[in-house]
């Protein structure tokens, strides 16, 4: 599979950011650049087509020139709704999803997930300690199952990934690459570190 052309990269920036006081997390700056832009830039070094899933401030995301896709389900019920919306509105068979608050994803993310997926329709990152199911390579074949799952009122990402027949891929050698920003204090610590 030619990764550059067969996988669509997706920055998931559609969340409500409750732990950040409702601030659009993707627009918070790290070293002078919005968090979501760090993720998009990292994906663009690996893939030729990248889009953004966002439910607020679309005009800011659109100013980048990237296509912005809003959730098709009411009330923006979490990252799975963003994944479904992108699959409903984008062509292609494979999608690499990454949350907007993971600015240090590794440069071999797409290649490693693809190489180690075997025949699974879904694979996600495991950093050696915990799963990161929203950093996932997903095949379009799971779209009907995902729609059914969401229509049943389910929202749990990890439960769905396993239900869809997926497995984790070990990235314990890149553990720090998957730390995400959930509070203003964490963002401040990152500003100091990097």
Swiss-Prot record:
Entry EC no(s): 2.7.7.77
Q: Record's HAMAP family?
A: MobA (MF_00316)
- Protein name per UniProt: Molybdenum cofactor guanylyltransferase
The entry assigns this protein to a family as follows: Belongs to the MobA family.
InterPro entries from the UniProt entry: MobA-like_NTP_Trfase (IPR025877), Molybde_CF_guanTrfase (IPR013482), Nucleotide-diphossugar_trans (IPR029044)
Coiled-coil features, chain-numbered ranges: none
**Cellular location of this protein?**
Cytoplasm
Question: What does the UniProt cofactor note say?
Answer: Both divalent cations appear to be equally efficient in an vitro reconstitution assay.
Q: Which enzyme class, named as a word?
A: transferase
Q: Which organism is it from?
A: Escherichia coli (strain K12)
Q: Which UniProt keywords apply?
A: Cytoplasm, GTP-binding, Magnesium, Manganese, Metal-binding, Molybdenum cofactor biosynthesis, Nucleotide-binding, Transferase
The annotated consequence of gene deletion is: Cells lacking this gene are chlorate-resistant, fail to synthesize MGD and accumulate elevated quantities of MPT.
Q: Which positions bind Mg(2+)?
A: 101
């Amino acid at each position: 599979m030619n990764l550059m052309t067969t996988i669509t990269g997706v920055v998931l920036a559609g969340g409500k950011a409750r732990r950040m006081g409702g601030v659009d997390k993707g627009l918070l700056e790290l070293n002078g650049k919005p968090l979501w832009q760090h993720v998009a830039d990292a994906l663009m070094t690996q893939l030729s087509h990248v889009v953004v899933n966002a439910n607020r401030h679309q005009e800011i995301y659109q100013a980048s020139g990237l296509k912005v896709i809003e959730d098709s389900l009411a009330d923006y019920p979490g990252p799975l709704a963003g994944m479904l919306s992108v699959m409903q509105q984008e062509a292609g068979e494979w999608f690499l999803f990454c949350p907007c608050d993971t600015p240090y994803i590794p440069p071999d993310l797409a290649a490693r997930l693809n190489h180690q997926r075997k025949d699974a329709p879904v694979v996600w990152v495991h950093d050696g300690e915990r799963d990161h199911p929203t950093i996932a390579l997903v095949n379009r074949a799971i779209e009907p199952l995902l729609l059914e799952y969401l229509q049943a009122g389910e929202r749990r990402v990890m439960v769905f990934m396993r239900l869809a027949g997926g497995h984790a891929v070990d990235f314990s050698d890149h553990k720090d690459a998957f730390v995400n920003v959930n509070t203003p204090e964490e963002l401040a610590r990152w500003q100091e570190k990097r």
